[in-house]
């Protein structure tokens, strides 16, 4: 189970990286993070089980924020695909600020909560010793790097467009209402 969890987190991170659809990219990311949880639970120590449960909670909260921002983009800007997000943060700065926070947490950048849960999973794997937990630890590192690539691809596209973003008709893209 440890080996399957390790393999799944890399494979699904690669699948997420390939996705052009914004919400589908987040969905594959969820599967990848569920394999972190599976890997940690399969270590079968108290520390690993606690880390697994912590990552379940942390990932749930952060992924809700990511999906809410993706839903706001879909509903208020009518954009579904990652290439369509070019320069959209100019029209939806609060939405993309929230997505940037979610991206930092999902990637595991300190001091965000995603770092804490991934740190505890990594510590549990290293404390057990042996080659299989260390292979899992390496898989978690590779997956975290892939997560940084596919999440910050969206962030950079939205905040720093490479090309002149196509003009969006006035009022067609705006922030979600507060209530």
Could you describe each region identified by the protein language model?
Residues 6-175:
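Hydrophobic transmembrane alpha-helices and their helix-loop junctions in integral membrane proteins
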Residues 1-5:
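Extracellular interaction modules
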